[in-house]
Amino acid sequence: MPLLSVKKLTENFDGLCANSNINMEINEGELVGLIGPNGAGKTTLFNMLTGVYVPSEGSIEFTKDDKPIKLNGIKPYKITALGLARTFQNIRLFKDMTVLENVLIAMNKDVDYGVITALLRLPKYYKSEIAMKKKAMELLTIFHLEDKCEELACNLPYGEQRRLEIARAMA
């Protein structure tokens, strides 16, 4: 069963066809590239896959825990929570936050405590925060940014900012 399945995906903007009849399957562990000239519809495809645009026609299915989930019409934040995330062509980091904070902020979907628990600093708050920090540091280690975890994102060179953005998307 494919991890991501796209069938007859089409997107029209007021009569302009940006994508037409796209079909593809991506299996777990595959690394796939999408190449094309400016204006070919690459970003439009990613916007449909991540819920920014609802396709004019066709279907998108993402498999999680061996269950296919139809993504058409699902809000982008819910698609991200399922595990399908994206980065953008332009870097969109929180420049005045640390490298670690940039990854942690992307983990807000994993917060399992309420405002009262956070305000009172109850044990559940600390347990959750420690688990998220551990996961964030694991991601930073994968992207060779663990030694920069306390640096402001704006102080990183461009290549490291891109890696941070990918780590944040994976959080």
Predicted features and spans:
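The feature captures the beta-strand-to-loop junction immediately N-terminal to the Walker
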Residues: 35-37
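Helix-to-loop junction immediately C-terminal to a conserved catalytic motif
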Residues: 50
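ABC ATPase NBD Q-loop/coupling interface
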Residues: 59-82, 120-125
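Conserved ABC ATPase "signature" region
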Residues: 115-148
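Hydrophobic anchor residue at the start of the ABC signature
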Residues: 166
